[in-house]
């Protein structure tokens, strides 16, 4: 595991984008595992900037996203498909037929999850998986207590996650209560993992994930067992470690 300290969010985003762009340059037809939320927005902006300068070519890249809210379609502005289109896909020369997000409108969880596992397998797995870190150590929607051996599955969102998300919706009743997410097993099968974390509110989760016991109560702690993990975090997130 390699840990890089970033001066601030902009520096964190640039460092993360450097690693992703190197992956694309080294393997133009690579499979990228992508994340949503506030953490990777700056990374995606930097990738778009380099694409606009002619430094990056996404035409052969495949992307597979971590998760999606169950019941939200791609045109819903709170869906993760919409987020990815808005923050990355609409701004680069990627073939959207090669961008995958779980089907939030598939009502049958077994069908949705089996289909997504097959998408990952049929593309030969993920070359580089980008991850954010939840305040409770969650990765994707794998909340504390999630079994390490699970593949893509349907999860009931915790009260804390629903609470954190309600600011994005008109009312709490509109907040999805379930999501489809890649499991820990899918994530751990990625060839490389890039974990980004910023802010003092992530400090305890980052410390527990990197140096605490490996336990389902801190889902990201399993990353200690992966043989190629890069962590990029700012000074605030690293305050309990460095």
Model-derived features: where do they sit?
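Glycine-rich phosphate-binding loop
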Residues: 124-150
